[in-house]
Amino acid sequence: MSESKVYPVKAHISNGALLDKAGYEAMYRASVQDPDAFWGEQGKILDWMKPYTRVKNTSYDPGHVSIKWYEDGLLNVSANCLDRHLAQRGDKVAIIWEGDNPAEDRKLTYRELHTEVCKFANVLKAQGVHRGDVVCLYMPMVPEAAIAMLACTRIGAVHSIVFGGFSPEALAGRIIDSGSSIVITADEGLRGGRPVPLKKNVDEALTNPETKVNNVIVLKRTGGNIAWHNHRDIWWHDAVATVSADCPPEAMGAEDPLFILYTSGSTGKPKGVLHTTGGYLVYATLTFKYIFDYHEEDIYWCTADVGWVTGHSYLVYGPLANGATTIMFEGVPNYPATNRMSQVVDKHQVSILYTAPTAIRALMAKGNEAVADTSRSSLRIMGSVGEPINPEAWEWYYRTIGEERCPIVDTWWQTETGGILISPLPGVTDLKPGSATRPFFGVQPALVDNMGEPLEGATEGNLVITDSWPGQMRTVFGDHERFEQTYFSTFPGRYFTGDGARRDEDGYYWITGRVDDVLNVSGHRMGTAEIESALVSHPKIAEAAVVGVPHEIKGQGIYAYVTLIAGEEPSRELHKEVKEWVRKEIGAIATPDVIHWAEGLPKTRSGKIMRRILRKIATGETDSLGDISTLADPGVVDKLIREKSEAA
């Protein structure tokens, strides 16, 4: 095997695993040779109100991109996550909630969760929400976030969740684009001991005249002081007190929309990624089962926020469709103590842990403090998600958190893919630190050069997927042309992931990072164009260019080149003001780590900014700038290098 270190499958894992090597090979072969037969069979993992007769109807043809799975089947997501478990698992714990404060926790059984979901579904109906309407959620990490999601699916409404860390401006943009007329929020969230002003942000977002919101349902989380609008605002607890707990699930078409989730692209405006009902849930359910080698007695903890796709697929829908116990954590992994994550593992006897490299690196920086006074002996499987994990962090996670006992499923996927595409399987895959290894069933990755020519064998190139899978996004909400343009125009006939990858002699994939203008900051995607447009909207900024630089905790940091308008001078105050400005426009995750005051930017004669050169300068690789003769003013490069050394 290539690469320096290989960790073979351990006997104690393979003995009880759902799949072994031969089983995986046979299923994978079947999935690509006859997708209709394979996915027709796998679709039975769900309960259908009307069984499908058609399975795969997809086209990647230029100008005719269309993705449909199970299109004549009818089902309901909440019925698959709740109702079907009531007879056998009604008293099993569905959600364990662990508060920001370690003294606070709650458990909800499947029966209790079902009751709460039915009630809140009736609340939505009473507020005039109909099938197909978009409901915006701007919630803290509390069980009510999952209850609201499932209530939407019960009545056929479409949820659009906005991460609680986004600013009022970013929230308003998503409310406007999705056409939401109702927002569900809380008075405040809690994170790391600090309140998050959710209701205040909603109030501010709704001052935008383009928003058309009639109702705001407010959960009382902290009891903090908030402004109240009698004509519009409703307390969650008041609304659920007067409704019936009986709400039959709506029969939805497999291709009816399930949710919209906004994600950054390489052009400025965030895209509303649209997922539909049947294929998405089949894929989330199946990937959860096999990738985490799920067994009935497992206690599963995914540390992601519901505001990100990982929270949708692997905190709520995948686990609950499998009848699992899923942990929802309000806090952060190092509060109030560095060993909080390990404490939670022990407290709830977590057997499967799914977290992000950013969290792992932050804990690694604290060494053994991260595991002090904890045993973590309940852990069986560990996972990584959000960005490629560097081998050093992988090794630390494996040795220190998992004590060399637990295989690590290093999962690669995207908001657009609905579920995991490339990942080890615990009983199947020999592990290599830093590699996402092999594709899941039905996933056909390929590497191509910049001209789109396929690259064979051990090589490096642009990562594309050559055929559809059930969890794939169907379109960009309200803009199918942008969907085709973004994902299918670079390499016609193939889905372009925007990532580069390396394939080794064993056919293992190693994700090398974005090849487009998208950053991965702490596992969160940020389009450089989005940050740049926030910067240039500042009255004193004439021009800005943003690139990613390596960051030892966040993976990538944000390096902003900023040119001021004539007559303005850089200052410490302005530096602070610009950072605050971006935080207000987008949210704290978009705050630049470095602001480089630049007299000018390197441009081609046609006016295109040469980001390749800016990346090299930002990372100090000034001896390999390549050809700069095409620049309108090559002298600008020396100036930038000089400015950087002066700033340092």
From Swiss-Prot:
Reaction(s) catalysed by this chain's protein: acetate + ATP + CoA = acetyl-CoA + AMP + diphosphate
Keywords for this protein: Acetylation, ATP-binding, Ligase, Magnesium, Metal-binding, Nucleotide-binding
SS bonds (residue pairs): none
Residues modified as N6-acetyllysine: K608
Pfam families assigned to the protein according to its UniProt record, in alphabetical order: ACAS_N, AMP-binding, AMP-binding_C
GO annotation, biological process: acetyl-CoA biosynthetic process from acetate
Any one annotated GO CC term: cytosol
Sequence positions that bind CoA: R191, G192, G193, R194, T310, N334, S522, R583
Binding positions (Mg(2+)): V536, H538, I541
Requisite cofactors: Mg(2+)
Changes after translation: Acetylated. Deacetylation by the SIR2-homolog deacetylase activates the enzyme.
Claim: Nucleus is one of the keywords in the record: no
Residues binding ATP, per UniProt: G386, E387, P388, D410, T411, W412, W413, Q414, T415, D499, R514, R525
Any one GO molecular function term: metal ion binding
The enzyme's E.C. designation: 6.2.1.1
Similarity comment: family membership: Belongs to the ATP-dependent AMP-binding enzyme family.
Task of the protein: Catalyzes the conversion of acetate into acetyl-CoA (AcCoA), an essential intermediate at the junction of anabolic and catabolic pathways. AcsA undergoes a two-step reaction. In the first half reaction, AcsA combines acetate with ATP to form acetyl-adenylate (AcAMP) intermediate. In the second half reaction, it can then transfer the acetyl group from AcAMP to the sulfhydryl group of CoA, forming the product AcCoA.
Protein known as: Acetyl-coenzyme A synthetase
Annotated source species: Aeromonas hydrophila subsp. hydrophila (strain ATCC 7966 / DSM 30187 / BCRC 13018 / CCUG 14551 / JCM 1027 / KCTC 2358 / NCIMB 9240 / NCTC 8049)
